[in-house]
Design a protein with these regions (language model features):
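Short, P/G- and charge-enriched loop/turn segments at secondary-structure junctions
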Residues: 56-61, 132-133, 198
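Conserved beta-strand hairpin/beta-sheet module of binuclear metal-dependent hydrolase folds
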Residues: 14-103, 210-224, 229
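Residue-level marker for buried hydrophobic side chains located in beta-strands
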Residues: 80-82, 115, 144, 220-222, ...
């Protein structure tokens, strides 16, 4: 009997805050899951079981270990959310993507800006809540940011098949923001706040962005799904089956890794186990390695 592609592991909550200069980043892990590598990377060959990326916490029993969540970012004057997980009470073909406990370390009305790195189902779910009659913005004081290329693609006919496969998450998690007048379409290099800006990184999706923080001489980068799994550090040319434009995603990922490697920049990948941030270092044998923050 073939093993299931997805295995739910456990739910999560807010993790230990990380300081980047005067900015505090709190990862929020909504849940862990294990996924068949071939679902993400259909052309993937056998993995070296002794390689760092094939061992816990990145892999278990032949499965990739992946988290879903978000990041609360507190600057001296702002409280932002980078991505919004999968949400609660939303009908999805994959039962893992529903009924996920809400564990934000701040009150919903404290968040003034929600930045979407892209509009995939696992990055927008908590953007809205059901008020008994309709889906409404979940963070009442917030503006929500996306790019024109991103919004146009996911609301257009070209993405219809993807929406059908994963449930109409655009209808319950994105369009209500637009209807409420709180969804702002910004440039892919938009300055979000002092020391916080977007950087274009197309490929995984057409309007995909990364989020850069610079504070008191320190730098961090929210990679979204540019690095979905540690495998892509060892093999940067490897794109997932969920990338809209695989070659473009590879080019953006390679540029990102060149930019942050060996610089001390703290990387916040969206789906690494326990949302542990780290630094990217060049591997003399090829590709890159990941040093979780605190490892040195």
């Amino acid at each position: 009997m073939p093993r299931p592609s997805w295995q739910r592991s456990s739910s999560g909550a807010a993790r230990q805050p990380v300081r980047v200069g005067a900015v505090t980043v709190t990862p929020v892990v909504q849940f862990h899951y294990r996924v068949d590598p071939l679902l993400f990377f259909p052309d993937l060959g056998p993995l070296d079981p002794d390689a760092w990326y094939a061992k816990p916490p990145y892999c278990e029993d032949g499965f990739l270990v992946v988290d879903i969540g978000a990041f609360v970012v507190r600057t001296p004057s702002r409280t932002l959310l980078v991505d919004a997980g999968v949400g609660n009470g939303k009908s999805r073909p994959n039962a893992c993507f529903d009924r996920r406990a809400d564990g934000w370390p701040v009150a919903h009305d404290e968040i003034d800006t929600v930045v979407f790195t892209h509009l995939h189902v696992d990055h927008v779910g908590f953007a809205t809540r059901f008020d008994g009659a309709a889906w409404v913005p979940a963070f009442p004081a917030a503006r929500y940011l996306t790019t024109a290329a991103e919004l146009d693609y996911w609301t257009g006919s070209g993405a219809a098949g993807f929406r059908e496969r994963l449930g109409d998450y655009v209808g319950d998690s994105v369009l209500p923001l637009q209807a409420a007048g709180v969804l702002d379409v910004v440039e892919p290099d938009h300055q979000v706040a002092e020391g916080v800006r977007l950087l274009p990184a197309p490929g995984h999706t057409p309007g995909n962005v990364c989020v850069e923080i610079i504070s008191e001489g320190q730098r961090a980068m929210f990679a979204g799904d540019m690095v979905h799994h540690a495998l892509q550090l060892a093999f940067p040319a490897l794109s997932t089956d969920f990338c809209v434009h695989g070659r473009c995603a590879t080019a953006s990922r390679e540029a990102l890794l060149r930019d942050v490697a060996d610089t001390g920049t703290v990387l916040f990948p969206a789906h690494f186990p326990d949302a542990v941030p780290g630094r990217v270092v060049t591997d003399p044998t090829g590709g890159y390695r990941y040093e979780p923050v605190g490892a040195r």
